[in-house]
Amino acid sequence: MTQVKVAALQLPFSDCVEENIEAVSKLVREAAAQGAKIILPPELFEGHYFCRTHDEDHFARALPVGEHPVVAAMQALARELEVYIPTSFYEADGHHHYNSLAMIDDEGEIMGVYRKSHIPDGPGYSEKFYFRPGNTGFKVWKTKYGTIGVGICWDQWYPETARAMMLMGADILLYPTAIGTEPHDPDLDTSRLWRRAMIGHAVSNVVPVVASNRIGTEGDQRFYGHSFICDERGDYLAEFGPSETGVLVATVDTVQAKKHRAAFGFFRDRRPELYGRLTQDI
């Protein structure tokens, strides 16, 4: 299919799983009613962003993909509405814990699981305490509407993530996110940088990008929203500010993007034989 409507959800979350499932489900229904076929909720929407502090009690939040209530709820919703819902969740796998995403298709089936590759560790974002670096490698999924590539939050800052998914055949890049203020520097607003990084991926890979972020204040941290959808030239098709709750829906044209990608020549002119340094540790 040439054109597809995609959606990004933006909303605040409580620390009650059931309340958050209900809130996200409501917005998923709104997006589907507007014709969206690929609907992206924010990262770890099951509760508060617990990685602000070190607390071993939070490990109990993690569950296997087949037992997680968020995944089960989105499977049922995807099946009912016939939409794709890339679903972020806290995964337990034996002794290991991952920041993961289940790609749920329009029949409610799990196409696969991606585990976040890049794990941050800084004030307010102490993810290394809770998450093991992903062992799935980057993933893309073929859907009825093109091939989807998904990176999770911190992955979005790395051009290697986007380029790897593009080389695997991605037609659209999606980034569920939980990002906000920096507790160590109240004057630092990364929302502009955050958007520019992903707009850069859109331009340098000539690909539409969808980013979904939470809003609201949790403890001493304010999550700044600014969810957006852009086309393959980096132009905004839809965007939110720092406080709106709702649904962004826009139409992207993957065939047009493919044509523009060929015309720009970025992939034609690649020199992989020169890039060996990229795979070496510093």
Residue ranges and their predicted role:
Residues 1-7:
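Extreme N-terminal starter segment of soluble prokaryotic enzymes
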Residues 19-28, 158-163:
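Short, acidic/polar
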Residues 63-66, 76, 92-172, 176-177, ...:
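Active-site catalytic loop in hydrolytic enzyme cores
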Residues 17, 25-107, 111-113, 179-200, ...:
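Cys-nucleophile CN-hydrolase/nitrilase-fold catalytic domain and related Cys-dependent amidase chemistry
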Residues 10-15:
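Short polar catalytic/cofactor-binding loops
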Residues 255-282:
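A conserved C-terminal secondary-structure "cap"
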Residues 63-85, 153-247:
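CN hydrolase (nitrilase-like) catalytic-core segments centered on the catalytic cysteine
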Residues 87-89, 100-103, 139, 227-229, ...:
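Short beta-strand scaffold segments in enzyme catalytic cores
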